[in-house]
């Protein structure tokens, strides 16, 4: 366990490193950044490549001045918790996972009650075989970016639940959530905010669930094919998903 209560920084890559070389990783490591603590580096402020069971709990700041505040390439079962007041950010792609080697990139869990953001790219970027991930943006949690890229991108067989804010601050015509793999489930809870499209591209087997309360109106611009479910029994139409408050029977033309 590494606990940071002060500042650990430098104009370097891999400030906290769980990966040395292939076959030489630190599994089941825990990194705790306390309130006021800072990990700051150039790229890969926390390098979790090829690790298993990495746990990061942040109440302070994890920052990459270039790319990847947290790098999860080829990692398994990582747990990232960004608590209220916590900040995770990078100039490009704040939290990243992909599969590029012989190990799977799978089972990551990201829970956010603080702020995660990227300036030039995506705040959360899962792609190229990153599977079975769970993303939970809690009430009060903010995930945003200021570029034309999607704010959050997920890959395959993953779950995203938004009770907070996901915000593409460049333009609402960009993707707030992008999906590049199949068989994912996205749930948008009451009082959650999504600025940007939900873009499923040519993927299949994806489900959008809405839980805004009986009789509540909402509208989300979507691209691609989705199964739509309103968990409160309201009627929801396909295309761009929406429901206009009309009691228990709701439609949007």
Where are these regions (language model features)?
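Long, low-complexity, polar and repeat-rich extracellular regions
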Residues: 1-253
């Amino acid at each position: 366990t590494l606990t940071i209560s002060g500042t650990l920084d430098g104009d370097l890559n891999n400030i906290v490193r769980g990966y040395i070389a292939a076959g030489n990783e630190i599994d089941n490591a825990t990194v705790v950044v306390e309130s006021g603590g800072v990990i700051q580096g150039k790229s890969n402020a926390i390098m979790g490549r090829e690790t298993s069971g990495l746990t990061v709990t942040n109440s302070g700041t994890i920052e990459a001045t270039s790319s990847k505040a947290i790098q999860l390439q080829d990692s398994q079962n990582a747990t990232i918790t960004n608590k209220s007041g916590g900040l995770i950010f990078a100039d490009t792609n704040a939290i990243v996972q992909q599969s590029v080697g012989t190990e799977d990139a799978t089972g990551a869990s990201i829970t956010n009650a603080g702020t995660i953001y990227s300036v030039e790219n995506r705040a959360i970027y899962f792609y190229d075989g990153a599977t079975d991930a769970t993303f939970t943006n809690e009430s009060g949690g903010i995930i945003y970016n200021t570029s034309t890229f999607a704010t959050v991108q997920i890959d395959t067989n993953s779950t995203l639940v938004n009770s907070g804010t996901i915000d593409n601050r460049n333009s609402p015509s960009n993707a707030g959530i992008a999906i590049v793999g199949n068989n994912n489930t996205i749930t948008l809870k009451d009082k959650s905010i999504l600025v940007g499209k939900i873009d499923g591209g040519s993927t299949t087997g994806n489900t959008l669930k809405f839980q805004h309360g009986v009789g509540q109106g909402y509208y989300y611009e979507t691209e691609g094919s989705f199964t739509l479910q309103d968990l409160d029994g309201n009627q929801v139409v396909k295309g761009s998903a929406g429901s206009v408050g009309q009691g228990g029977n709701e439609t949007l033309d």
